[in-house]
A protein has these predicted regions:
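Amphipathic alpha-helical coiled-coil/heptad-repeat segments
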Residues: 1-36, 42
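Non-catalytic DNA-recognition/assembly elements of restriction-modification systems
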Residues: 9, 13, 18-20, 60-85
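Phosphate/adenylate-binding "loop-and-lid" substructures adjacent to NTP/NAD/dNTP-binding pockets
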Residues: 26-66
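Sequence-specific dsDNA recognition surfaces
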Residues: 57-62, 77-89, 103-132, 150
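A short beta-sheet element
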Residues: 101-102, 120-185
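Specificity-determining recognition surfaces
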Residues: 181-196
Length: 196
């Protein structure tokens, strides 16, 4: 078995809940999802995020494998506070607000020296401003599903139109998505099926 095959095997066991024994003291996933739904409802009420379309429940045909009883199958939209396409504007060599493009992300890192600027209305900036824990996904072309977890934003920056930003509750660790290999295969197939 190669190192890559071993890594894939360990990841597969982990996402199925078979790598370690389940701790009965861990909070059930259903409780976390309920807290996220409450937080989302409050943000909608405060007009900080927009209400999204209701998501279809997971049906039997969509379940690829069994998971521990404390876990729950859900849609990405159930754990995200928001899912939003990026801002469409031409790149500029100078300006105040940087615009991260998929080509600026290499090996999981933004190459900030090459990130261009863009013109954006002041009133639109808060909707597109990147924050730590956001995850960006490429939504078109040969890089569909390529992802980047925003760790640090050294300059005010938004994200370009060919990217999708997912934003999470503080109760959700974006690093989990990276560890689960969401940018590899799984998310790519979700995007292709438009199952978000």
């Amino acid at each position: 078995m190669t190192a890559a095959e071993l890594k894939a095997s360990i990841l597969d066991l982990a996402i199925r809940g078979k790598l370690v024994a389940q701790d009965p003291d861990d909070e059930p996933a259903s409780e976390l999802l309920a807290r996220i739904a409450e937080e989302k409802a409050e943000l909608i009420k405060e007009k900080k995020i927009k209400k999204s379309k209701p998501l279809d429940p997971i049906v039997e045909d969509e379940i690829p494998f069994e998971i521990p009883d404390e876990w729950v199958w859900c849609r990405l939209g159930n754990v995200c506070m928001s899912i939003q396409y990026g801002y469409n504007a031409p790149a500029k060599p100078e300006g105040r607000i940087m615009m991260v493009r998929i080509s600026d992300i290499q090996n999981g890192v933004v190459c900030w020296d090459g990130v261009p600027y863009c013109e954006i209305k002041e009133s639109d900036i808060p909707d597109y401003l990147l924050r730590p824990n956001d995850i960006l996904f490429a939504r078109t072309g040969g890089t569909v599903g390529k992802s980047y977890i925003v760790d640090v934003v050294p300059h005010e920056a938004i994200y370009a139109g060919y990217l999708i930003r997912t934003r999470y509750s503080a109760d959700v660790c974006a690093k989990y998505f990276e560890a689960s290999g969401i940018s590899v295969g799984r998310f790519r197939s979700l995007l292709r099926r438009k199952a978000l």
